[in-house]
Every structure is written in C-alpha cells, then in structure tokens.
Amino acid sequence: GGQQQRAAIARTLAMQPKVILFDEPTSALDPEMVQEVLNVIRALAEEGRTMLLVTHEMGFARQVSSEVVFLHQGLVEEQGSPQQVFENPLSARCKQFMSSNR
C-alpha cells in the first residue's frame, strides 16, 4: 500500500536521481492512502525535483506540473502548460477527456 510506495520513493531519493519516474503511483491504493502518497510527490515538486508522472489524478497533475503531455493510444496527442492542456486543449480527444474529468 502507501507504506510500500513511500519506501520506494525513499530508496529512489537515496540514489539522488536527476529525474524520478512515477507510473500510476496511486492506482492500487486505498483512497485514504492516495492522499498520503500525493502529499509526498507534491513535496518533491515543491523542492524543485524533476519528475515524470503517469497518472489519472488530473486535479493533482494540474496542481504540480510545469508541463503536461496527453497520450492517446501510446502517442503524444497534446503537450503544453497545465493551463493550456487543461483549459484550452486543441485536439478533440483531449477536449473530450478533460471535460469528462472535471
């Protein structure tokens, strides 16, 4: 659960990576654990850590991201600032996805 995620993050930080990769870090967690893991990731973002985060937590992604990439069928469909991608998506698929996740 969340304890395993936090331990994995601590092990990663011990290696002092230039970039931290997160692939759906909250997908298998209980709802109460999700917020704990997101708080750890938010703190890393506030420290200025470079991270690549794959997530369906759209509100969180919007808050902590400096750049957003929207993928569809494994291809980059849209890329830009959180404001641009979340508020003014260009592609029809991205518009549909964002409107269903508000």
Predicted regions located by residue number:
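Conserved catalytic motifs of ABC-family nucleotide-binding domains
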Residues: 16
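ABC ATPase "signature
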Residues: 79-80
